[in-house]
Amino acid sequence: MSNRRSRQTSNASRISDDQMIDLVSKLRQFLPEIHERRRSDKVSASKVLQETCNYIRKLHREVDNLSDRLSQLLDSVDEDSPEAAVIRSLLM
């Protein structure tokens, strides 16, 4: 009985090929390197997923760098100044 139940759950959580194509197409729109290519250029789903992971890593690095810069800026201004309050709000 539990085997049957797990198969039903497994089938229910799977996405269809059409859903996968739609998701990959949506991801493609967010990737600058792939989005700039002509629509006629075929890009595999695995390439889109790989580029998505690379792009997310790049965005994480940019966020880290910006946080570091804001922290440095915060250290250079008066703690009670309006500028410091704005910087603190950006870091939160």
UniProtKB/Swiss-Prot annotation:
Q: Which family does it belong to?
A: Belongs to the bHLH protein family.
Q: Which GO terms describe its molecular function?
A: protein dimerization activity
Q: What does this protein do?
A: Atypical and probable non DNA-binding bHLH transcription factor that integrates multiple signaling pathways to regulate cell elongation and plant development. May have a regulatory role in various aspects of gibberellin-dependent growth and development.
Q: Where is the bHLH domain?
A: 4-59
Alphabetized InterPro entries for the sequence = bHLH_dom, HLH_DNA-bd_sf, PRE
| Source species | Arabidopsis thaliana
Q: Which UniProt keywords apply?
A: Gibberellin signaling pathway, Growth regulation, Nucleus, Transcription, Transcription regulation
Extract one GO BP annotation from the record.
regulation of growth
A GO cellular component entry from the record:
nucleus
Q: List, alphabetically, the Pfam families matched.
A: bHLH_ILI
By what name is this protein known? Transcription factor PRE5
Where is this chain's protein located in or outside the cell? Nucleus
